[in-house]
Every structure is written in structure tokens, then in C-alpha cells.
């Protein structure tokens, strides 16, 4: 399996389960939304299955965008080393990687 395919598998599993394997963050803009909107956005992130080449050039499923209640929402997975000080040297290796999922309003990017 290529690294890109393994990274995609790990990203999809992390994003869909939203438990273990990393951290989840939401920006101030998302946190300021009413709880039902936050919950709906989280479900959309978990169920996201549209990865056009322009958003996902390496096929790793590490970025997504969608509209919710008239606002553009982005989500992004970044890869850090276990100390979370530097980027991961090998995002395909869970022992060397902490995944961080950030959910944000597009205008916060």
C-alpha cells in the first residue's frame, strides 16, 4: 500500500470515528455557533465523502469544504510528531503521528 493510501485510510478512520488517534479542534467561529449547528457540522465532517482533486491533490482526504446554514465550512487534518512541536516525519505511521482535525469557518482561514 502506498503512503498516500495508508494516510487516507488513517485520516478517514480518524475523521469518521472522532475518537482516539488524535485531537479535534474548532475555531472560535464554530464554537460561537448554536450547539445544534455545531453538532450538524460535526456530522457533516464525519460523513464527508466529496474529495475533488483541487481540494485533495494527494488523495489523502485531509481537507474538506461544505456549506452549512449559508456559511462555508472548512475542515483540515494536520500531522504532528508525538510531542506536537513539529510536523510528523511519517504521517502513514500512527506511532510517529498525532492527527489534529481543525474545523473552521472559511473566513477564519
Predicted features and spans:
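Compact soluble domain cores
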Residues: 2-67
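Short, compact, well-ordered microdomains
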Residues: 62-109
